[in-house]
């Protein structure tokens, strides 16, 4: 099943979706509820064993979901998994796998020191785990998150105190308290055009810094 939730867009995309994809369930919000609250609303309607949180500015491949289902079926202790994300030019996106953003890790990242030494300064982007190697990681990107519906319900979804940004870090960390592992599934790739659905303005900057401070 495909559930599309629209956060008060003004570009006629709701009408387009309903016309071109009549089998898709489209929910149109009158107001912009924010990333987490909107996804929680959609997830409550999902009936499958698995849920995949997927941004509108992504492209998945023919066997993407099949690969993730098979991976989770074979690994019952996996909590949340995510793919190797690349941008529209084919460049690897570092946020595909991350460590917890401690103050030290965030400082190293903001100063660009991770480019000098992955071993000493690469915690933010979990650079100890190679790009093309599957492995455990603390944080996965909200642009593509795959997990069992049961786990999503146990976690009570995203924390709706985050309007946008930071909710993926929060939910990735909370699954640890339930004894599950997050996993970077490098052999499955997804194209992410990175922010094409988000306007960059003062409100965007404020939401980002508020999320990082929460």
Model region roles, listed by residue range:
Residues 6-15, 31:
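A conserved acidic beta->alpha catalytic loop
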Residues 13-14, 38-39, 63-65, 77, ...:
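Acidic donor-diphosphate engagement hotspot in glycosyltransferases and nucleotidyltransferases
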Residues 28-46:
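Glycine-rich, basic loop-to-helix element that forms the pyrophosphate-binding segment
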Residues 51:
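Short aromatic/hydrophobic "clamp" motif used to bind/position activated sugar donors
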Residues 59-95:
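Conserved donor NDP-sugar-binding/catalytic core segment of glycosyltransferases
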Residues 100-137:
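Short, flexible, basic/aromatic active-site loop/helix in glycosyltransferases
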Residues 127-165, 174-180, 185-187, 193:
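Aromatic-glycine-rich donor-binding/catalytic loop that engages nucleotide-sugar donors
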Residues 169, 173-214:
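Active-site-adjacent helix/loop segment of glycosyltransferases
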């Amino acid at each position: 099943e495909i559930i599309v939730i629209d956060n008060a867009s003004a570009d006629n995309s709701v009408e387009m979706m309903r016309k071109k994809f009549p089998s898709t369930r489209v929910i149109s919000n009158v107001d912009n509820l924010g990333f987490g609250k909107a996804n929680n609303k959609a997830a409550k309607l999902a009936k499958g064993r698995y849920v995949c949180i997927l941004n509108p500015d992504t492209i998945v491949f023919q066997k993407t979901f099949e690969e993730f289902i098979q991976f989770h079926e074979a690994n019952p202790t996996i909590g949340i998994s995510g793919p190797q994300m690349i941008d529209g030019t084919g460049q690897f996106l570092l946020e595909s796998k991350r460590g917890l953003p401690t103050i030290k890790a965030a400082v190293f990242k903001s100063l660009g020191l991770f480019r000098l030494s992955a071993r000493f300064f690469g915690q933010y982007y979990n650079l100890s785990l190679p790009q093309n190697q599957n492995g455990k990681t603390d944080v996965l990107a909200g642009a593509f998150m795959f997990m069992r519906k049961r786990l999503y319900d146990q976690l009570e979804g995203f924390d709706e105190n985050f309007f946008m940004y930071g909710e993926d870090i929060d939910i990735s960390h909370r699954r640890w308290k339930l004894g599950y592992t997050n996993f970077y599934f490098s052999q499955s790739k997804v194209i992410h055009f990175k922010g094409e659905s988000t306007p960059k303005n003062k409100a965007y900057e404020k939401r980002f810094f508020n999320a990082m401070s929460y």
